[in-house]
From Swiss-Prot:
Coiled coil regions, renumbered to chain: none
Superkingdom of origin organism: Eukaryota
PROSITE patterns registered for this protein in UniProt: PUA
Pfam families, sorted: Pre-PUA, PUA
One GO cellular component term noted in the UniProt record for this chain: cytoplasm
Gene field: mcts1
Phylogenetic classification of the source organism: Eukaryota, Metazoa, Chordata, Craniata, Vertebrata
InterPro entries attached to this UniProt entry: MCT-1/Tma20 (IPR016437), Pre-PUA (IPR041366), PUA (IPR002478), PUA-like_sf (IPR015947), Uncharacterised_CHP00451 (IPR004521)
Protein known as: Malignant T-cell-amplified sequence 1
Function: Plays a role as translation enhancer and involved in cell cycle regulation.
NCBIfam families cross-referenced by the UniProt entry: unchar_dom_2 (TIGR00451)
Family annotation (Gene3D superfamilies): 3.10.400.20
Keyword presence, Transferase: no
Annotated keywords: Cell cycle, Cytoplasm, Growth regulation, Transcription, Transcription regulation
Entry's Gene Ontology molecular function annotations: RNA binding
UniProt organism field: Xenopus tropicalis (Western clawed frog)
Amino acid sequence: MFKKFDEKENVSNCIQLKTSVIKGIKNQLIDQFPVIEQWLNQIMPKKDPVKIVRCHEHIEILTVNGELLFFRQREGPFYPTLRLLHKYPFILPHQQVDKGAIKFVLSGANIMCPGLTSPGAKLYPAAADTVVAIMAEGKQHALCVGVMKMSADDIEKVNKGIGIENIHYLNDGLWHMKTYK
């Protein structure tokens, strides 16, 4: 999604949101990530301006004080940015890939089933279409945000094909954007 993303070329406009819209977004975030509820006022303080940065390909990035927090495509589900995930790692369930998969994930490749079932990997129970943080064997922080394409049980049974779709990874265009004023 953000492999060839560039702030100067892909951002079309930025609008400040009304309080009623912010409330709706906060409720949507709580529905999607129940764990985040007690931290939401810390992540999105009431007095700080909340803006939506609109980009090409119908991508919207939610910002507070210029800090990129969440993004979505076409009114779909929100995904946390990796910078937010590094501050609050508990907001998403984790899956762990082995060391051999790291370079492929960091180049934007989807996570294949064998990379989740090999000895260095850890596959935790999760349903299909769940948003997950991808951790790496021996690393502390998440290296990508992904969406489960199969349930964890199916990944273990089939052990072929794409297990998790890579949505946003370290060093992609969104990671390089850092802040938006």
